[in-house]
């Protein structure tokens, strides 16, 4: 019995090898799990559930196959695919979760999240995040014709790359105080997240216990997952 976690695949038509690796992962690994949790940035970008891109139909069908085999799939939005909505969730058989969720797995309580909310030192990004998560702004964006949304998304990706290239690596990582506060607010001693692309298992000293923060890796040249069983929590990398 095991539950799997992945994040930061950044699937796109420009990276067919990653798509192939994900489809293989679904067929060989996830289909045998108790559940699959995707902690954001499954896609490189998402401009609306009405985008007819064939890749998205392919991924939806692969995820739907999990549901058909009795494996539930849960999704937390990332900073790239925060507009993924109910229509795609139904098509793919995924259950959408809030940005922060406590799950009880085999007697172990774990808080799961994408991870960008922990990067509080990056004030510019947090300001941007608050803006684009405004429901009114999201609704206005989704009302635009698809061709305009594509242009806006391309522009924003370019701006993000330029902005990040000039930022300190420190401010793009998690803030230790935000990590501790998240542990304590949720009364847990385990955390799993992605976003930073810095796979590792960290120990965190809390007031009354030692906690563990597990960071998923991005799918660039290899896959990354966390496998939770009754006995342990493992961070695993694997070839596509």
UniProtKB/Swiss-Prot annotation:
**Catalyses which reaction(s):** UDP-2-N,3-O-bis[(3R)-3-hydroxytetradecanoyl]-alpha-D-glucosamine + H2O = 2-N,3-O-bis[(3R)-3-hydroxytetradecanoyl]-alpha-D-glucosaminyl 1-phosphate + UMP + 2 H(+)
Q: Which GO terms describe its biological process?
A: lipid A biosynthetic process
Q: How is the cofactor bound?
A: Binds 2 Mn(2+) ions per subunit in a binuclear metal center.
Record's CDD domains? MPP_YbbF-LpxH
Which EC class, in a word? hydrolase
Could you tell me the superkingdom of the organism this chain comes from? Bacteria
In this chain, Mn(2+) 2 is annotated as bound at 41, 79, 114, 195
Q: Which cofactor does it need?
A: Mn(2+)
The EC number(s) given in the record are: 3.6.1.54
Q: Which residues bind Mn(2+) 1?
A: 8, 10, 41, 197
Intracellular or extracellular location(s): Cell inner membrane
Could you list this entry's UniProt keywords, alphabetically sorted.
Cell inner membrane, Cell membrane, Hydrolase, Lipid A biosynthesis, Lipid biosynthesis, Lipid metabolism, Manganese, Membrane, Metal-binding
One GO CC annotation: cytoplasm
User: Could you tell me the membrane topology recorded for this protein?
Assistant: Peripheral membrane protein
**What terms describe the molecular function in GO for this protein?**
manganese ion binding; UDP-2,3-diacylglucosamine hydrolase activity
Residues that bind substrate: 79-80, 122, 160, 164, 167, 195
Q: Does the keyword RNA-binding apply?
A: no
Q: In which pathway does it act?
A: Glycolipid biosynthesis; lipid IV(A) biosynthesis; lipid IV(A) from (3R)-3-hydroxytetradecanoyl-[acyl-carrier-protein] and UDP-N-acetyl-alpha-D-glucosamine: step 4/6
According to its UniProt entry, what is the function of this protein?
Answer: Hydrolyzes the pyrophosphate bond of UDP-2,3-diacylglucosamine to yield 2,3-diacylglucosamine 1-phosphate (lipid X) and UMP by catalyzing the attack of water at the alpha-P atom. Involved in the biosynthesis of lipid A, a phosphorylated glycolipid that anchors the lipopolysaccharide to the outer membrane of the cell.
**PANTHER family tied to this protein:** UDP-2,3-DIACYLGLUCOSAMINE HYDROLASE, UDP-2,3-DIACYLGLUCOSAMINE HYDROLASE-RELATED
Family per UniProt?
Belongs to the LpxH family.
| This protein's name | UDP-2,3-diacylglucosamine hydrolase
């Amino acid at each position: 019995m095991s539950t799997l976690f992945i994040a930061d695949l950044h699937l796109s038509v420009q990276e067919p090898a990653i798509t192939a690796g994900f489809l293989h992962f679904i067929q060989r690994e996830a289909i045998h799990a108790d559940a699959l949790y995707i902690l954001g940035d499954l896609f490189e970008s998402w401009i609306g559930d009405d985008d007819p891109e064939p890749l998205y139909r392919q991924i939806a069908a692969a995820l739907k196959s999990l549901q058909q085999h009795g494996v539930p799939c849960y999704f937390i939005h990332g900073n790239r695919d925060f507009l993924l909505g109910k229509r795609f969730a139904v098509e793919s058989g995924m259950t959408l979760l809030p940005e922060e969720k406590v799950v009880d797995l085999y007697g172990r309580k774990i808080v799961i999240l994408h991870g960008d909310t922990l990067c509080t030192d990056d004030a510019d990004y947090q300001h941007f995040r608050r803006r684009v998560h405004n429901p009114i702004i999201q609704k206005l964006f989704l009302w635009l014709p698809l061709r305009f949304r594509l242009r806006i998304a391309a522009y924003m990706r370019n701006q993000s790359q330029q902005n990040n290239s000039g930022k300190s690596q420190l401010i793009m990582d998690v803030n230790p105080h935000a990590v501790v506060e998240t542990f304590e607010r949720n009364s847990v001693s385990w955390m799993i997240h992605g976003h930073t692309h810095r796979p590792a298992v960290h120990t965190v000293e809390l007031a009354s216990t030692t906690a563990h923060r597990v960071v998923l890796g991005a799918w660039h040249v290899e896959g990354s997952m966390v496998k939770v069983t009754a006995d342990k929590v493992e961070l695993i990398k694997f070839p596509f």
